[in-house]
Amino acid sequence: MGLKRPWLLGAVVLLTLIQVQGGLAEWTQCRMGFSKEKYSFLVPKNLETDKALGRVIFNSCEGPVRIQFASKDPNFEIHKDGTVYIKNPAKMKDNRKTFRVLAWETKGHVYSTNITLKREGHRHRQDLFSGKHSHHPKSETGLKRQKRDWVIPPIIVSENEKGPFPKRIVQIKSSYAKEVKVYYSITGQGADTPPEGVFAIGREDGWLNVTRPLDREAIDNYVLFSHAVSSNGANVEDPMEIIIKVQDQNDNDPVFTQSVFEGSVPEGSKPGTAVMTVSATDADDSVDMYNGVITYSILNQEPKEPTNKMFTIHSESGLISVLTTGLDREKNPVYTLTIQAADGEFGKDRTTTATALIVVMDTNDNPPVFDPTQYTAKVPENEVGYEVARLTVTDEDIEGTDAWNAVYKIIKGNEANYFSIQTDTGNIGLLKTVKGLDYELKKQYILSVIVTNKANFSVPLQTSTATVTVSVEDVNEAPIFLPPVKEVSVSEDLPSGQVVATYTAQDPDKEQNQKITYVIGNDPAGWVSVNKDNGIVTGNGNLDRESKFVLNNTYKVIILAADSGSPSATGTGTLVLNLLDVNDNGPFLEPQQESFCQKDPGFRVFTIIDRDLSPNTYPYKAELTGESNENWTAIVTGQSILELRPKKELEIGQYDVMITLLDSFGLSNVTKLHITICQCDGDKMQCEEKAAIAGGLGISAIVGILGGILALLLLLLLLLLFVRRKKVVKEPLLPPEDETRDNVFSYDEEGGGEEDQDFDLSQLHRGLDARPDVIRNDVAPVLAAPQYRPRPANPDEIGNFIDENLNAADNDPTAPPYDSLLVFDYEGSGSEAASLSSLNSPNSDLDQDYSALNDWGPRFTKLADMYGGDED
């Protein structure tokens, strides 16, 4: 865009006719570098060492220049003249192989090109040199000439060119054009492959044209192949490679990789400390031109304290670092920088900006300070873990960090380690007692406490100190027994009232002059007493070393000492009695039950036990008394073993053997042994059944008895259930007809007792079956009688049975008075019971008024005639 005149100059050069004389291309433009960006060599399948493949040409444009070549593929090497040789033997597995070649010139610039090896069989005009010392072919004098490939440098076309289009770039012309009519065409990217139609060539004149503006950022190189054919389509020349390189124009702004960059730096950092790196990209060319070279700078800094240039940025790398001292988080915790990225040779062409946020990290540059620095406290004596004071500090560093967390230490006044100080979650120092203070020992403590941080100071700082004055308060302390545990030795036969020990306590509160009273705190056996005034402990006369309350010959008694303070305080002392043994327990035998066989019984061993201690134990003597001496022999063997054996064969049964044992001092004790003689021989004991009969029932017998009892109870229960089932008979809802009875009750008795049910059963009616015939005149019913449901077998259907039959009876058209005319004045034959007519009512029949019967209708006419008419 801004290189209009250079384009015109380049156009003049590029439009210079390139004559291809005998296949040798001529050009006037020179550009340092390889003559081609790609070389193609035709090679056999097997690559042998020291074989020359071809030569790459480097254009220095400035006369002889020392060039060094190198191959990126270790199987090939490049000599100084550009000849490519095979270094290691290999095989061409594929039809082509590509590797890269580099060239360095004296100024340090590096150039590169690609070499493609093609297997034989592909159409190519490149010669293959036969040996390492082969020479390149040269033109000979005379008419004969040697042809070689078309070689032209890349054609440079600037991007973003203005029209009119198409624009001519270069003209291609074959040397055979004088002999035959030559037609030109191009193929490749930008011609017949996407993007198609960017380049076009005159079919007859060979002018290569560009048809539209180019964009280097889209495609920076186009590789085309020009073709020259005759009118019959035959190739006049081999296809020639044309490389069109798009020259960059500065048409793209730099772009930062982030809109906002974030970094951090510790406060107090020295100049040169790296903070962060910003980066930007530019789509323009930064290799051959300065269009894509980016230069960084700082446009603005906020806040501008302590100076407006606290940071600097490297113009090429974008590294931001500290420029000067004075970073202080407490004053300026964040800096905002406006960063500019500019391209061009002097960094003044296209620009863009971004923001860099730099957080100043806190360091421990502020000490914690006590507020206040003086503390006073009162602490009761003997209190452990008592909170003495809560020390507070202020710190300007960030709360919750190691630079803010306080660490307290007592540096003076705590030589006896009575106090400790810890930091709580609120950064407060909690001063507590770790041991009980003693008012009588020391009444006041003055402590010096310093405070630091968990993190070390980043700069030299002075620590803060606080003073804590602790006053000890006097409290009523319990009396103290000295020693706390006192041991005395007493004989277990100590007489009652005998002094065991004097066990007293001292009152720490000497200034209060209090009286101490002693009592027994714990005496499980009740063996001692204590004088409440002087602490003298006496025995109660019943000490026993062999008691269950004695453990390892010792007996413990707790003594309490209470002072007269208000409230009273009580101290505790332990009196340990070591009981001395006396010979008060006679020896006895274990076990006290044993069995012998009737035949060849042998002997049994018993253990002699004596609860006393030596020398009140062995040696022992054994004596059999009464009948036991006639049947048994007892011998003491060893210290505590007794052997017992029968003197003769005894009858089967139980025997009680009385043995008297005497210890070394003659203290005796009689043991009764229960011996069973069993029907067996020697050691084959068979005493189970006998022992069970003699000593009680065995387990199997007990189980059998219990099983029999349980079976009997079960049988009894089944019998009761059977009887109950037989008795419970479900009564029908209606009684049978043959059980219907009439009863005559006398209601004029108002008395009680049993007379109301004392009546003559013989006076009852004999029953409906024995009644005399009733005089009746039957009239045949006009309608059919209803069908009554028979009595169901299931008792649950009785209710339905009654309801249905009752309904049928209520609607029976054959029921009286429709079906019969009954004569009611016939009372039947004589009855064993008295006639009711003998019972006269207060008024006779003559006094009764039956005229109302006439109002009952024709159905009751006969009845009205009988009672309301004449005597006739």
Swiss-Prot record:
Protein name: Cadherin-1
InterPro entries: Cadherin (IPR039808), Cadherin-like_dom (IPR002126), Cadherin-like_sf (IPR015919), Cadherin_CS (IPR020894), Cadherin_pro_dom (IPR014868), Cadherin_Y-type_LIR (IPR000233), Catenin-bd_sf (IPR027397)
Keyword Membrane: yes
Listed Acidic residues bias regions: 747-758
Region forming the signal peptide: 1-25
PROSITE patterns documented for this protein: CADHERIN_1, CADHERIN_2
Stretches assigned to the Extracellular side: 149-701
GO terms for MF: beta-catenin binding; cadherin binding; calcium ion binding
Repeat recorded as keyword: yes
Organism whose genome encodes this protein: Xenopus laevis
Alphabetical keyword list: Calcium, Cell adhesion, Cell junction, Cell membrane, Cleavage on pair of basic residues, Cytoplasm, Endosome, Glycoprotein, Golgi apparatus, Membrane, Metal-binding, Repeat, Signal, Transmembrane, Transmembrane helix
Location within or outside the cell: Cell junction, Adherens junction; Cell membrane; Endosome; Golgi apparatus, trans-Golgi network
Gene name of the encoded protein: cdh1
Annotated spans, Disordered: 739-758
Transmembrane parts of this sequence: 702-722
Residue ranges that the UniProt entry lists as topological domain Cytoplasmic: 723-872
Binding site for Ca(2+) 2: D251
Quaternary organization: Homodimer.
Binding-site residues for Ca(2+) 3, renumbered to this chain: D282
Membrane protein topology class: Single-pass type I membrane protein
Function: Cadherins are calcium-dependent cell adhesion proteins. They preferentially interact with themselves in a homophilic manner in connecting cells; cadherins may thus contribute to the sorting of heterogeneous cell types. Promotes organization of radial actin fiber structure and cellular response to contractile forces, via anchoring of radial actin fibers to CDH1 junction complexes at the cell membrane. E-cadherin is a ligand for integrin alpha-E/beta-7.
Expression sites by tissue: Abundantly expressed in intestine, stomach, liver, kidney, skin and eye. Also expressed in heart, lung, testis, ovary, muscle and brain.
Positions of the pro-segment in this chain: 26-148
Glycosylation sites: N209, N456, N552, N631, N669
A GO CC annotation given for this chain: endosome
SMART domains: CA, Cadherin_pro
